[in-house]
UniProtKB/Swiss-Prot annotation:
It comes from Bacteroides fragilis (strain ATCC 25285 / DSM 2151 / CCUG 4856 / JCM 11019 / LMG 10263 / NCTC 9343 / Onslow / VPI 2553 / EN-2). Part of the 50S ribosomal subunit. CDD domains: KOW_RPL26. GO terms for cellular component: ribonucleoprotein complex; ribosome. InterPro entries: KOW, Rib_uL2_dom2, Ribosomal_uL24, Ribosomal_uL24_KOW, Translation_prot_SH3-like_sf. It holds the Pfam family KOW. Keywords: Ribonucleoprotein, Ribosomal protein, RNA-binding, rRNA-binding. Belongs to the universal ribosomal protein uL24 family. One of its GO terms (biological process) is translation. This is Large ribosomal subunit protein uL24. GO terms for molecular function: rRNA binding; structural constituent of ribosome. One of two assembly initiator proteins, it binds directly to the 5'-end of the 23S rRNA, where it nucleates assembly of the 50S subunit. One of the proteins that surrounds the polypeptide exit tunnel on the outside of the subunit. Residues 69-106 are annotated as: Disordered.
Amino acid sequence: MSKLHIKKGDTVYVNAGEDKGKTGRVLKVLVKEGRAIVEGINMVSKSTKPNAKNPQGGIVKQEAPIHISNLNPVDPKTGKATRVGRKVSSEGTLVRYSKKSGEEIK
C-alpha cells in the first residue's frame, strides 16, 4: 500500500461521490482500510438505543468513512484542491508540500 497523502487535522476537498465539491477537516484516518472520517462529509443516520448519554435514544446523524482516493488536501495558499509532494527540508525532516503553489502543508 502506498503512503497516505492526508493526515488527521488536514482540510480536504471531496473530489468524487455524493459530497463532491465540499471541504472538511479530517477527524480520523483509518490506515488499514484506506479511508478517512471527515467532519460534515458522508453523513449517515444511525439508530441508537436509550442510554445514559442519550436517554431518549432515536436516530443520530454521524460521519461515515470515505475512501482517501476521493479526497485531496486543500492548498494553504490558494484554498483550492492540490496534489501533495514530499521533500526533505533544511532541517533534514520530510515535509509535505503543495504541488500547485509549493507551499508547505502543516
